């Protein structure tokens, strides 16, 4: 019987299935950070248990770490306590840990693939909603809650219900200036933030195949923003070439056997999906979100939508509230929206390819006078090192952009990087919820190139015209 990629990944990890469909699923890789793990470790300690499979766990501090000078540690007491607790638990249980001062430290969804901790065919979980990022490698990856973090630590398994399967087929040549971020925003704009609810999404088609692993990670990262449990891409040569030689990748005969298996990780011809969505990449333009949900997005040459033209009363009400919060009026051209700050970073867009794209836009130019702050936050210490070897840091600094240390930063404002009330930000992150980047802050989701262009011009512009 023809199987989808999701079917193959699921079935190869089933330990047992109950009469109600509840499945005990084996977990290959468990990623942990400082925000969702403290209670899990405390529960483990109170129960007198220890991690079942020490080598399956990889820990890193990312949400609360400062992106400025780290020589004096973390000023905020709550943030400091969370990181210190992570440090203690790592040493207490002998788990691999990249501390704040380790050059391998970075955002958990950047360092996992970077280290080869994420490999094709794996089940990958983390107490973080954007764990779907790792599905780009032909893996089954999704976020879990704190109680589930404890369960995985103790048993190396997870109780789960199988999702339905959705295929998002993207075909066509990607236009110049249009990126993976624009593709995934266009997908979410098409199906909505609830469109993927109850599904695991496989992203396929010639456009997806043409993307680098960085681009595929961006796509899968935001599968959760479409409501999906997981996002994934079939394995191909791009996947295999990326993971080869990584610190935790197999070597020698183990590599050969692994590659042989990885090449089977694709949906079979004739496999049935519960839902199929198509998108013509040639029609996609650079995207800019205008509201307080990722589905509230339009092309850069468009206008802020008019709620009066929305027939659905619930959607109309949401649009009206979003416009009030965002301080925007219907029919305003997107290119007339001025910004106060720029954030280039997050687990969506902080990899070397993202930084190169942004640097190419700002090279030889300077930040607009009305832009108070433009910050670039690499996804890991290793990304930062590579960017500096390529001279990208100098390009950004010469353009008036700040070059920071790695971490989650302004994506969710859990450290000192945040917006003030009313400030408007061109952000390469994944969520534009109310207060996401700071109380009263207004977030517009864009690609790295679009964020960089807005920082130079002081308002949104079509990067294709630069």
From Swiss-Prot:
Keywords: 4Fe-4S, Amino-acid biosynthesis, Branched-chain amino acid biosynthesis, Iron, Iron-sulfur, Leucine biosynthesis, Lyase, Metal-binding
CDD domains: IPMI
Cofactor remark from the record: Binds 1 [4Fe-4S] cluster per subunit.
GO molecular function: 3-isopropylmalate dehydratase activity; 4 iron, 4 sulfur cluster binding; metal ion binding
Catalysed conversion reaction: (2R,3S)-3-isopropylmalate = (2S)-2-isopropylmalate
SUPFAM superfamilies in UniProt: Aconitase iron-sulfur domain
Cofactor: [4Fe-4S] cluster
Entry-linked Gene3D superfamilies: Aconitase, domain 3
SS bond list: none
GO BP, sorted A to Z: L-leucine biosynthetic process
Superkingdom in the source lineage: Bacteria
Enzyme Commission number(s) from the entry: 4.2.1.33
Binding site for [4Fe-4S] cluster: 347, 408, 411
PROSITE patterns linked to this entry: ACONITASE_1 (PS00450), ACONITASE_2 (PS01244)
InterPro entries (alphabetical): 3-IsopropMal_deHydase_lsu, Acnase/IPM_dHydase_lsu_aba_1/3, Acoase/IPM_deHydtase_lsu_aba, Aconitase_4Fe-4S_BS, Aconitase_4Fe-4S_dom, IPM_dehydratase_rel_enz, IPMI_cat
Function: Catalyzes the isomerization between 2-isopropylmalate and 3-isopropylmalate, via the formation of 2-isopropylmaleate.
Subunit and interaction comment: Heterodimer of LeuC and LeuD.
Family according to the record: Belongs to the aconitase/IPM isomerase family. LeuC type 1 subfamily.
Record's protein name: 3-isopropylmalate dehydratase large subunit
Species per Swiss-Prot/TrEMBL record: Herminiimonas arsenicoxydans
Gene: leuC
């Amino acid at each position: 019987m023809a199987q989808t990629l999701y079917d193959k990944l699921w079935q190869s990890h089933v330990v047992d299935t109950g009469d109600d469909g509840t499945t005990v699923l084996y977990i290959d890789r468990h990623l942990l950070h400082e925000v969702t793990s403290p209670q899990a470790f405390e529960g483990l300690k109170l129960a007198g248990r220890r991690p079942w499979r020490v080598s399956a766990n990889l820990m890193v501090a990312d949400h609360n770490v400062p992106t400025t000078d780290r020589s004096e540690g973390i000023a905020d007491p709550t943030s400091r306590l969370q990181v210190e607790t992570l440090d203690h638990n790592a040493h207490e249980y002998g788990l691999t840990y990249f501390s704040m001062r380790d050059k391998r430290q970075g955002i958990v969804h950047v360092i996992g693939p970077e280290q080869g901790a994420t490999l094709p065919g794996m089940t990958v979980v983390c107490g973080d909603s954007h764990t779907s990022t790792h599905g780009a490698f032909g893996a089954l990856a999704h976020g879990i809650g704190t109680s589930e973090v404890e369960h995985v630590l103790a048993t190396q398994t997870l109780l789960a219900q199988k999702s339905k399967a959705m295929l998002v087929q993207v075909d066509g040549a990607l236009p110049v200036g249009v990126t993976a971020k624009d593709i995934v925003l266009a997908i979410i704009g098409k199906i909505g933030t609830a469109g993927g609810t109850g599904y695991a999404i496989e992203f396929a088609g010639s456009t997806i195949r043409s993307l680098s692993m960085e681009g595929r990670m961006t796509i899968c990262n935001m599968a959760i923003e479409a409501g999906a449990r997981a996002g994934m891409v079939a394995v191909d040569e791009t996947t295999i070439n990326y993971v080869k030689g990584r610190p935790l990748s197999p070597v020698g005969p183990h590599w050969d056997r692994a590659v042989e298996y990885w090449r089977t990780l694709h949906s079979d011809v004739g496999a049935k999906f519960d839902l199929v969505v198509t998108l013509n990449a040639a029609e996609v333009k650079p995207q800019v979100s205008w509201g307080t949900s990722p589905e509230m997005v339009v092309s850069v040459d468009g206008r802020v939508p008019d709620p009066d033209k929305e027939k659905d009363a619930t959607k109309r009400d949401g649009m009206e509230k979003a416009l009030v919060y965002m301080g925007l009026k219907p029919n305003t051209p997107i290119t007339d929206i001025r910004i106060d700050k720029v954030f280039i970073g997050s687990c969506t867009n902080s990899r070397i390819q993202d930084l190169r794209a942004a640097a190419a836009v700002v090279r030889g130019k300077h930040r607009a006078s009305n832009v108070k702050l433009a910050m670039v936050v690499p996804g890991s210490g290793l990304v930062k090192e590579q960017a500096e070897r390529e001279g990208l840091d100098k390009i950004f600094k010469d353009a008036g952009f700040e070059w920071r240390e790695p971490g989650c930063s302004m994506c969710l404002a859990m450290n000192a990087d945040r917006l003030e009330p009313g400030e408007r930000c061109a952000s390469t992150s994944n969520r534009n919820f109310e207060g996401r980047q700071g109380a009263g802050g207004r977030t517009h989701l864009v690609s790295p190139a679009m964020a960089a262009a807005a920082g130079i011009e002081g308002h949104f512009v079509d990067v294709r015209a630069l």
